[in-house]
């Protein structure tokens, strides 16, 4: 888990890979979002942890559904 991802940025993950043991999985949490999935994947992120990108207090079930669908579509397009 790379948290907060928005502080490290994809370039930080690339630098960390030089010292991490081969095969170490890294998941960007906090800062990964649909518009930057491709950047994280290019930096070798193995996945993402998302919270407020999907749900914030007061969101309706419909808005959560729409956000989740948009996130899945962005992930599929980036991967």
Locations of the language-model features?
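Active-site-adjacent beta->alpha loops and helix N-cap segments on the catalytic face
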Residues: 2-21, 33-38, 57-70
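Expand to "…catalyze enediolate/carbanion chemistry for C-C bond making/breaking, isomerization
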Residues: 73-79
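Short loop/edge segments at beta-strand edges and connector loops
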Residues: 30
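Structural motif
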Residues: 43-44
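Structural preference for beta-strand elements that scaffold enzyme active sites
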Residues: 23-27, 47
């Amino acid at each position: 888990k790379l948290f907060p991802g928005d502080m490290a940025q994809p370039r930080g993950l690339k630098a960390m890979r030089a010292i991490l043991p081969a095969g170490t999985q890294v998941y960007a949490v906090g800062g990964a979002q649909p518009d930057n999935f491709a950047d994280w994947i290019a930096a070798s992120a193995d996945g993402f942890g998302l919270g407020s990108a999907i749900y914030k207090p007061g969101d309706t079930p419909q808005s959560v559904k729409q956000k989740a669908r948009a996130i899945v579509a962005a992930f599929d397009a980036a991967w």
